[in-house]
């Protein structure tokens, strides 16, 4: 099986979309605490997706562009659309800050739900297309080692803060087996401090029974 550079990060992004959509659905827009929480979640989502699109444009798509420029142009145009949907959500956040009327806030909640569904639906289709079309082009023109090298460029471009956010959502979106294999790979190939930070993040993010299973499997492999 060929290496799928989108697999883990897209699982993280889908988990973000699913959980934020559920939070938004149950938010009372006249409850300030609930609104502050969901607006923080939405802000994180659009920030992460904007950064993800930047990385794809500058590292992944650029590797394909020399061979298939028209395909890359089409995907870059999809990223333009994605940024427009992000901007709409950011605009609604700014509108909310100026509202004092309960009825207006309730109406804005409906606008938020529609805008987020549009954002979610677009990105679900977009990511599936990347996993099909872009992956197949990467596999045609590059070896797995070369694809991993591209991925390392993306990783090296991350701040510690953005890495922490992506790790959190990868852990929430991956299966136990996938997490175990990921931790084993990091332990083999990365500095010890990186493994330690990922392990501590797993301890924080995984439910007790899931984390115990992960630890047990790591101990068996030790």
Q: Which ranges hold each PLM region?
A:
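Small-residue-biased structural context
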Residues: 1-222
